[in-house]
């Protein structure tokens, strides 16, 4: 059914998120998704149906037929191993475990703000074997946090030379001003003083839009 398919997709995505962030299956509830309490057994500290045990070994009434996410994740991973199914996170884990290196002298990584802990592990393995490494990123443009991206990996990276580009080739001045006001409250970020692409631009505020209203507005504007 559509409902079970949605739940299955979320569980697979959670398994991948745990791999990308190098976390244990027991941390499944920390994933940035919302779970339907009618279909999923929630952790004991938030689920009154849990009987005994803790976050790692809860027990449930015999008539509780809701899905156990950690059990399903373990079953999914076992299935992959038995049937030779390999996902992207699995490939990265194999690269890391086997110390597989590309036959290149220069390493270039774009959108570094969107890499995960697992990807960073591979990067750490590779960079020591390179003649030159270039990384590019903007901690104000993280869009894959839901996949486990960690902008601190960019902010804390030790580099020989740090170049901050002065110009935005995307945003006109009015939009850039709004963006700057929105991000200036973030305690840990790289300060930037960008020049706008051009003067002007239009900013439109829409109060409490639904997702479909937001999509329609973007489509109408574009």
Label every PLM stretch briefly:
Residues 209:
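Acidic-and-aromatic substrate-binding clefts and catalytic sites of carbohydrate-active enzymes
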């Amino acid at each position: 059914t559509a409902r079970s398919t949605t739940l299955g997709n979320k569980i697979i995505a959670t398994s991948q998120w745990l791999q990308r962030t190098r976390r244990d299956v027991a941390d499944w509830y920390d994933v940035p998704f919302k779970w339907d309490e009618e279909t999923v057994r929630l952790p004991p500290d938030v689920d009154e149906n849990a009987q005994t045990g803790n976050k790692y070994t809860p027990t449930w009434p015999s008539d509780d037929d809701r899905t156990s996410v950690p059990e399903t994740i373990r079953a999914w991973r076992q299935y992959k191993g038995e049937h030779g199914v390999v996902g992207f996170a699995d490939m990265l884990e194999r690269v890391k475990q086997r110390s597989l290196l590309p036959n290149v002298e220069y390493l270039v990584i774009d959108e570094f703000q969107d890499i995960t802990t697992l990807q960073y592990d591979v990067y750490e393995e590779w960079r020591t074997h390179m003649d030159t490494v270039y990384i590019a990123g903007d901690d104000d443009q993280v869009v894959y946090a839901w996949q486990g991206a960690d902008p601190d990996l960019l902010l804390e990276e030790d580099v020989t030379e740090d170049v901050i580009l002065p110009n935005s080739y995307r945003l006109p001045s009015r939009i850039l001003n709004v963006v700057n006001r929105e991000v200036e409250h973030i305690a840990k970020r790289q300060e930037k003083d960008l020049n706008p692409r051009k003067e002007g631009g239009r900013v439109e505020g829409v109060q409490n839009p639904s997702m479909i209203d937001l999509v329609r507005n973007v489509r109408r504007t574009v």
